[in-house]
Amino acid sequence: MKSNLPLFYYQPNDVPYLEKSLELNKRIFKDLLVIKGTDCPEFNNVYKHMCYNSDAFERLCFIRFFKILKYIKENNIDKFLYCDSDAIFLKALDFEKILQDEKCVACRPKEQNKFEDVTGAHFSIWTKDGLEDFCNYIIDVYTNNIDILLPKWEWHVETKTGGGICDMTLMYHWYKGKKNLYEAIGGTFDRGIGMPQNNIADEFEMKGDIKRLRNIDNQIFGTNYNDELVEFFGLHFQGDKKNYMYNL
């Protein structure tokens, strides 16, 4: 049975893999919406770029939240899911039950390196109030509380380590939820098929440049560090791994 909650994407430019993602996610969701648009003065006027990735790219990663918020407020949508354009849901779960009383349930690695500071929205379940709270938090940090971001950025500069401050950093500081999609009941959501880490470091067995995945009765499993099969409820074809999406 398909989910009654809508699934949102944010994709301001044309990319070939979006259509494949939409095609596959239509198996799980009745309603899929692609939000576009890049104008967001309330954010752009306060943003301070502290990242080795491009300014334009990092701005869009933040702007997506404001654009989706505008749409759901105008259309009276109280609960929804979001995924990146290179992410695929594999199973229709009871997303409302997972959300319960939380403002948001996202992907927060239990084990993180020094100044990694990430919580990902690439698979996430939201309430309207939760998204509005997060957008307000972003504005407040860049306006009044930017000091909480500086230690991480200074570490990147001093160590000449790539990355920096991004939307996942702000979400890391904002996110107070007790739930974690990497710790879903009965399985997990994927951080990225090109990395062994998920909730913890070196969590999954690799085959070449991607996680070793098995299709058992039309369900996708990975093998964890305890040699146990773990079902994936969603796969993230991040970076140069997007071509693997076409194998589903």
Predicted regions and their residues:
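N-terminal anchoring/stem segment of glycosyltransferases
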Residues: 1-52, 73-74, 127-129, 133
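A short, glycine-/small-residue-rich helix N-cap motif at loop->alpha-helix starts
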Residues: 17, 56-63
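An acidic/histidine-cluster motif and surrounding catalytic segment
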Residues: 44-58, 141, 148-151
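Short beta-strand-to-loop element that shapes/binds the nucleotide-sugar donor at the catalytic cleft/hinge
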Residues: 104-130
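Catalytic core and acceptor-binding pocket of nucleotide-sugar-dependent glycosyltransferases
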Residues: 133-248
